[in-house]
């Protein structure tokens, strides 16, 4: 299975500035070689996908999407991971996913803080943990109990999104390539203004 990145500008991205994005990403040495003077966001994304540099591709797309889009992408992949990976979704994970959907549609700080508490109650080897952390890191104060206001570092949420999807690929019990390609296809669809439906082995999940 191959994946083609549209070479026209993807209209749904928050940023296509490779210099800005590249400064935030821990690139592999192989991926860094594609950051040439004439490169575009789309050509670099296509190159890292063609060379199976999956985490580089996830990171680039997670950073380029707007925070709510990026988190919705991780949420959609995680929902599909539970469906096809036969993982047990306990009450805490169910609550976290339901609340994430609510937050993406209508974000507010109370929900963000609840999602942080739920994330801390889930092991960090679960993709769901990183969705909750991504929401917490996307905006607001990340030291609410310290008596000071600390804004999250720019793009910190994108690291949580990348971790979520990478873990889903590792733990799904399917071909990792199948999961990466399905997730990236959904992310590219979101970046192009689509709904970002995730499909693994012919199954779909909103």
Which positions does each model-derived feature cover?
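Short, glycine-biased loop/turn motifs at secondary-structure junctions and
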Residues: 1-124, 136, 140-206
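Hydrophobic, small-residue-rich transmembrane alpha-helices and their short perimembrane loops
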Residues: 131-132
